[in-house]
């Protein structure tokens, strides 16, 4: 069923995200710097903050939400209750979902990662506006939506149906050429961070929307998710891909309600523009302390590892894990290395089980965990002890993210992580 409706011509040149914000506000147009109150299509809250939000609303006598049908409550940060506190949070979250009569509650084993499965299930569509408590809501830019983090002010959205925002400025990054084999969108994301750090792309992403343009048809929804998850670690407030025909086909197939995709006008204003050539890009690894600390993999090849993790809201869709599984096929995880694989959604888990890829992962010695954040949530599962070395597809590698503060956290693409788990040391997947 085609659920897309015809977009209206804007009254002044606007970017796609500006059109989405204007539409959510019921305004003919918006401009950077405007203070507005968008009405979201979806409101997302995850399990780790929901108890404090419920307590805050209870304390001021709010026991009903303005638009409960738009609310999505997700258990993804602590799927495996590793402590009595986690079990208490789970019970509190179930009570909140029932008391508020929310439209969508995805408890343990029901949905997966909140920044992944709503796009797979059609809860978020092109042209939608989303409020979220978590910064990785930038992922919805992969499907052509806009997601803004409001932190604990999500309680105000739940109570009143909206919250103020200042319309951000937009930056346009044009991608030229095609990614070489074994180079993943994650590599491109870290490359962007590296170029910004070096000053070769003079972008200040703080409270900006980063929009992609250029040779974009090569990027699947999974690749777009990988690219949308990275800039938020560099300060971006939003990320946006204009929907491709393939993305629109997916959205039309799964959308739960009519949607209207938005595209930037040719004469739309951007605070700054830049271009990147993709043809000579190679696999990169981010050194501990920040994704922008990226170097060619050759500079760290041979470094022994203890731990590997494939997952997170940046690299946990079926395409990501399938690519890693093919690297692992007929191979074994090196002795002394523990490899965790965390699918991003129940849908991905089912697809892996429906093929031989789940068996490939098991035969290789990987530990497959339930869909969710996995170790990326401050290592509530699979932590590192002092001095251990990890390579993963986590969204960041800040010191202490996976447990011990002196553990060394390296980031790579799913193929690099899988190959390194087999080799027992960081290795270019092209050389395994």
Please name every model-derived segment.
Residues 1-432:
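Fe-S-dependent hydro-lyases/dehydratases of central metabolism
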């Amino acid at each position: 069923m085609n659920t897309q409706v015809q977009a209206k011509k804007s009254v002044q040149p606007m970017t796609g995200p500006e059109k989405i914000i204007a539409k959510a506000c019921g305004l003919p147009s918006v401009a950077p710097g405007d203070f507005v109150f968008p009405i979201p299509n979806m409101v997302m809250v995850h399990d780790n903050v929901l108890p404090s939000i419920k307590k805050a609303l209870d304390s001021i006598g709010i026991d009903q939400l303005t638009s409960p049908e738009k609310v999505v409550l997700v258990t993804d940060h602590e799927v495996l209750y590793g402590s009595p506190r986690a079990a208490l949070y789970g019970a509190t979250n179930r009570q909140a979902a029932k008391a508020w009569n929310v439209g969508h509650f995805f408890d343990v084993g029901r949905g997966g990662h909140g920044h992944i499965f709503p796009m797979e299930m059609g809860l978020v569509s092109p042209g939608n506006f989303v409020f979220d408590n978590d910064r990785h809501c930038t992922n919805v830019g992969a499907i052509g939506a806009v997601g803004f983090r409001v932190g604990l002010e999500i309680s105000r959205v739940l109570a009143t149906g909206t919250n103020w925002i200042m319309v951000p400025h937009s930056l346009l990054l044009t991608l030229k050429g095609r990614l070489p084999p074994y180079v993943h969108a994650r590599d491109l994301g870290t490359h962007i961070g590296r170029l910004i750090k070096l000053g070769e792309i003079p972008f200040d992403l703080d409270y900006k929307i980063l929009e992609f343009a250029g040779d974009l048809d090569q990027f699947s929804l999974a690749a777009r998710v990988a690219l949308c998850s990275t800039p938020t670690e560099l300060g971006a407030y939003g990320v946006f891909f204009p929907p491709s025909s393939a993305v629109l086909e997916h959205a039309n197939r799964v959308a739960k309600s009519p949607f209207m995709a938005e595209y930037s006008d040719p004469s739309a204003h951007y605070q700054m523009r830049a271009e990147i050539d993709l043809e000579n890009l190679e696999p990169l690894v981010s050194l501990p302390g920040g994704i922008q600390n990226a170097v060619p993999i050759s500079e760290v090849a041979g470094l022994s590892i203890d731990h590997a993790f494939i997952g997170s809201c940046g690299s946990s869709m079926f395409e990501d894990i399938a690519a890693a599984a093919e690297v692992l096929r007929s191979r074994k995880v090196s002795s002394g290395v523990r490899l965790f694989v965390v699918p991003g959604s129940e849908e991905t888990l089912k697809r892996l089980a429906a093929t031989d890829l789940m068996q490939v992962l098991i035969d290789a010695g990987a530990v497959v965990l339930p869909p969710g954040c996995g170790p990326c949530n401050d290592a509530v599962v699979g932590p590192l002890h002092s001095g251990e070395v990890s390579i993963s597809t986590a969204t960041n590698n800040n010191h202490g993210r996976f447990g011990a503060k002196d553990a060394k956290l390296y980031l790579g693409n799913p193929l690099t992580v899988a190959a390194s788990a087999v080799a027992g040391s960081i290795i270019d997947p092209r050389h395994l």
